Every structure is written in structure tokens, then in C-alpha cells.
Amino acid sequence: MTTAKSGTTIEIIGAVVDVEFPRHAVPKVYDALQVDENNLTLEVQQQLGDGVVRTIAMGSTEGLKRDIAVKNTEKPIEVPVGKETLGRIMNVLGEPIDELGPINSKEKLPIHRPAPSFIEQSGTTELLETGIKVVDLLCPFAKGGKVGLFGGAGVGKTVNMMELIRNIAIEHSGYSVFAGVGERTREGNDFYHEMKESNVLDKVALVYGQMNEPPGNRLRVGLTGLTLAEAFRDEGRDVLLFIDNIFRYTLAGVEVSALLGRMPSAVGYQPTLAEEMGALQERITSTKKGSITSIQAVYVPADDLTDPSPATTFAHLDATVVLSRQIAERGIYPAIDPLDSTSRQLDPLIIGEEHYRVARGVQETLQRYEELKDIIAILGMDELSEDDKRAVRRARKIQRFLSQPFFVAEVFTGAPGKYVSLQDTIRGFKGIINGEYDELPEQAFYMVGSIEEAVEKAKSL
């Protein structure tokens, strides 16, 4: 029996479910449909005509049969927002998955919303200190900016992300939202306990749609996290939004696109790649009410930065932190590439003359060393001029001083984590490029915090 608001399933292929409605009551695209018998939510993706809509399931379609009643909720998926979500883990539908009872929020918001209009948006040039030397010096983050952590498999995107959350959440004392998009469940679990032990869990809302979830779930979980962040922003707060991993969002889009029968474009990606990325990224912005500072991990397939997925993401970011396998192989962590990473904030008008000069000096020294590497490999160090020898020695010290022990890696390394203030970072690197520490051995600069620690370490070597 079908009423005006209900339809029936007519075809099920994997995560795609076709539902037939009376012709005068066809659901709109992005409306949420409810299958009560299987407790399943479907999201309308296409209207096929004759009252039939094609939907993507937000959960498993196992056991779903034809001719089951489907109810139209007549609105998009809505999720709870506000302070009640802090310290809780939710799924894509905003349902708690931490077994701590229901989330009694006063308000629910749809996950599909237009981006703030041009007039509502606001820019800012205030810097966000992270306590990580290489980031603060060479690719500083802006409050209300967007940052991408680019890296291939196993170079430390998630560890860097967790360190940033720990440092910023503790020092910044604002609210954070973490969206786990298609990542490992183990990492989500580790992250939850890490937050609990650092006593910052009551300031973080967690939204997980991990690797084992169906593609529709992974495609929408980023929007769920974003909706929570937007709600905090519209209350007038400065909120942090962490997304791990934006590539899996694209990948879920590829799967959904293929299931819906669209013709793939370059490298097999969906033809709507740029539009899907824009729909998410354009909403991550600061308005006159408050700001969203977003830090996103971006997996780089086969370490190829020109792949359409990372290349599309680049266009939306204010700062890019590129993690390099070559640096990781040398045992320097965080394995951030000081020459490849960039930031729009690296401007003397924003960061000040001294910071700018030191950052450029560090990059020039490292660039000179890169250029001399071939000569050193063929002829050896002895063939270089005195100036070049000095540049190489300083560059090697800078490379080591760019490493730093992390708080979240204490368990593995046994070395206590270090938070280095921006002033200490600038002072340390300024000293190295000015030759104040030329007599210290290279090893003294490895895995220390401030320059004073390097001087202390040199005494024991």
C-alpha cells in the first residue's frame, strides 16, 4: 500500500537502490528516504522519470528485497549540532556510535546547505601557531585558513594531523570537529583514546565513516562533520575542522559515480570531480560571525602530485604541507618538505620582515645544498669552494633542526614531545644561517625542540 509520501523498492544493485513513487509525489534530489523494515536511510541522487528515483544507501543493503515500503522524509539528512555533540562519536546520520546514549541536541541541521554568500565571508591574516618548527617557519597557517597535508602512503599524514590537533586544541582551547572519511577504524580508535588521555575530548566532536562503510556513507560523512563545524561558527566561535582523508571523499565519489552509471573522466575519476570538491570546500570558510580553520590530510596516489584528485584539492588551499618520502627515509620527522611546502601567509606584510627573511634564508640555503648534491656525489666535498662548504654544513644542520619529537609519538620513540614557540623557532634558525652555531656537530640539532636544547645536546656528544 503506497501513500503519497511512500514508495516501493524496485531494483537493488549493490549500494544503489531504485525506488518507485506515485508520479505526483516524486522526491527531490538529496531528499532522505527511510526504509523502516531494514532501518536504512537512502539519499536520492537522480530522478529517472515515471516516478522512479535512483538512490544511494547510507548503510548496508544486505537483506533488502524488492517491494519494500520506503518513506520520503521530504528533507535532506539532518544531524544534531551544538555543544551536546562534543566528546561524542557519530556516524554520517548523526547517530551516536560510542554507546554513551542518545545525543539530546536542541537543533538539527541538514547536511546539504549553500555556501556562505560573498557578502557574508570575511578574510583574516591572523596567524595560528602550531608549535611545529617547520610549519610555523616555512608554511605558517592562517586563522580561518585552509591547510592541506599532502603525502603518499606511510609518510606520516595522520601522525602530523594528530600532533596538530593536540597542539592547537590544547593551546587554542576552542572547539574542534574531526571527520574521519574512509580511514582505518584502528586510527579512529587510537585518535579517540589520544584525545581522552590529553583531556581535550570534551572539546572535540567526532564523525566517523571509515573504510568498511558503503560509498554513500563515506561520500557524505565529510558534509556531516562540516555541518557541525558550521553550526559552531554561526554561534560566533573560532572552530577547527580536521578532515582525514580528503582523497577518500573523492574515492567515494568515484564509486558512487560508477554505480550511477556516469562515464568516467581522466584516470577513471568521476566527471563531476571539481564540482564535488567545490561543494565541500566552498562551505569551509570564515564569515563575519566566526571562523573555520580547516586542516585536511590528502593522500597522494603513487606520490604523484599531478594526479587529478590532489591537483583539484590544491586549488582550494591557503597553505600546502607536502610530506616527502625522501625526508622520511633519512629519519627526519616530521617529514615535511621545506622547499615544496608553501603558504599564502609567507609575506612580509603578514608575518613581519624578520620572520620572512629567516624563512627565505633557510630555503635559499637548502636550495643551494640541493644544487650542490650532484657535484658532491661525483667529486666529493673537498672540491667545493669555502662558501659552498659552509652552505652545505649549515644546510645539513637546518635539515636536522627541522626535525622535532612529537607528543603523539612519545609511545613509539620514548622521546618526550616538544612544543616550540614561533619566537624560539625564528631565533634558532636565524642563529644557524648567521653562523652562530657553526662549531656545533650536526647530530646536536637532530630531534630537539629549541636551539638551547641543541647547545645542551652538543655538550654530551
UniProtKB/Swiss-Prot annotation:
- What cellular component GO annotations does this protein have? plasma membrane; proton-transporting ATP synthase complex
The reaction(s) catalysed by this protein are:
ATP + H2O + 4 H(+)(in) = ADP + phosphate + 5 H(+)(out)
Q: Pfam families from the entry?
A: ATP-synt_ab (PF00006), ATP-synt_ab_N (PF02874), ATP-synt_VA_C (PF22919)
Is the Oxidoreductase keyword given for this protein?
A: no
- Write down the SUPFAM superfamilies for this protein, in alphabetical order: C-terminal domain of alpha and beta subunits of F1 ATP synthase, N-terminal domain of alpha and beta subunits of F1 ATP synthase, P-loop containing nucleoside triphosphate hydrolases
Q: Where would one find coiled-coil regions in this protein? A: none
Listed PANTHER family: ATP SYNTHASE, ATP SYNTHASE SUBUNIT BETA, MITOCHONDRIAL
Name of the protein described by the UniProt record: ATP synthase subunit beta
Species name for this entry? Answer: Coxiella burnetii (strain RSA 331 / Henzerling II)
Q: Which gene encodes it?
A: atpD
